[in-house]
Amino acid sequence: MRFKGLDLNLLVVLDSLMTARNLTAAARSINLSQPAMSAAVARLRAYFGDELFTMRGRTLVPTPRAESLASPVRKALLDIQLSIIARDKFNPAESCRRFRISLSDCVTLIFFRQIVDRVARDAPAVSFELLPLREDHDELLRRGEIDFLIMPEPFMSSAHPRAALFGERLVCAGCRTNKRLPHRLTFEEYMSLGQVAVRWNLAHNPSIEEQFLLQHGLKRRIDIVVQSFCMIPPMLSGTDRIGVMPLRLVKHFEKVTPLRIVDLPLSLPAFTEAVQWPAFHNADPASIWMREILLQESSRMGSWGEERQTVKSLLSSNLRSDPLCIKASQLAEPRSS
C-alpha cells in the first residue's frame, strides 16, 4: 500500500532496522528473507534520498536522517497498533497479552511475585517478560519496547507518566554471628567495617548512600562489589562484613539467611519505588488494567505517608552528634536521568 508515493510497509522495515541494528536480525523479526530485506533497504534509500545506514562490522549505524525518522515512524506504528489494530475492549480473562517490564530483582522478590499471583487468578493467559534495568530505560519507553519501568522514582526521567508504588528505606545488614556489628552502629564503625557494595551499570546515577559519601569526600571500605542487592546476603554469611540494603529485601532474606538489621548512622532520605509507562499507552485498556493492579497491590504494602513518617521518626531518634550525620539530612535527591 502506498501513501503519497511511499510504500507503508517500508516503515515497518525501517523501524525493525533501527531496533535490531543488524540486517539479518531485523529481517527475522518481521519474517522477511534477507534478500527481501536488502531490497526493502534499497527502496528506503531511494525514497528518502539518503543512505540511512552504514555498515560497521555487522552492525548497522544509522545516519542523522535515519535517526530523525526513527521516533516519528515508531510513534506512527504504535498509534496504528493501539488505535486501529487493537480491540477497543480489553477482557483480562480472555487476553493473551504479554507485558514487558523492566525492574530490579529486588522489586521482583518483594513486590512483583504478588502481581504474578494476582494476574494468574484474574487473567490466566496474560504473561510477563521481566527484564533487567538498563541505562537506556528512557529510550526503551519512548520506543515502546517495554510496557512498564519500575525503579526508584528519583532516577526516572520526567518524559513519561508515572505513579508512586511504595516507600522504602535503606538499612545496614550483617550476619547474625557478626560480633563486630553492634546494635547501634556509629559512623566510624560503619566506615571501618568491610562492606559488600552494589554497583549497577547505571554509572551516572550513584546509589543513595554512595551519593552521600561522595558529597562529603568520604570513601568507605569496600571488600566486595556485586551487581545486585540480592547478592549481598550470601557474601555476609559467616563474615564480619556489612551491606546496605532495602529494608523489605533484608526482611525477605531474613527468612532463610541468619541476618541482623541495624539502622544506618546516616540520615539518608527514604525513597519511593514508582512505575512508569510510555505516554502513548495512557489510554490503552490493557495498560490501564495493569496499572490498576500494580497500584492496588502496592497499597497492601503500606502507604507512602506511613512509611515516610516511620522513617522520619526512626532516623530522628538515632541521629548521632557526629556533624556528618546531621549534614546527611540535607542530602539532595539523585538527579533524574
From Swiss-Prot:
List the GO molecular function terms. DNA binding; DNA-binding transcription factor activity
- Which Pfam families does the UniProt record give? HTH_1, LysR_substrate
Q: What InterPro entries would the database entry show?
A: LysR-type_TF, LysR_subst-bd, NodD_PBP2, Tscrpt_reg_HTH_LysR, WH-like_DNA-bd_sf, WH_DNA-bd_sf
Domain HTH lysR-type residue range list: 6-63
Which of UniProt's keywords are assigned here?
Activator, DNA-binding, Nodulation, Repressor, Transcription, Transcription regulation
Q: Which residues bind DNA?
A: 23-42
Further information in the entry reads: There are at least two nodD genes in B.sp strain NC92.
By sequence similarity, the record places it as follows: Belongs to the LysR transcriptional regulatory family.
- What does this gene product do? NodD regulates the expression of the nodABCFE genes which encode other nodulation proteins. NodD is also a negative regulator of its own expression. Binds flavonoids as inducers.
Record-given protein name: Nodulation protein D 2
| Species name | Bradyrhizobium sp. (strain NC92)
Q: What is the lineage of its organism?
A: Bacteria, Pseudomonadati, Pseudomonadota, Alphaproteobacteria, Hyphomicrobiales
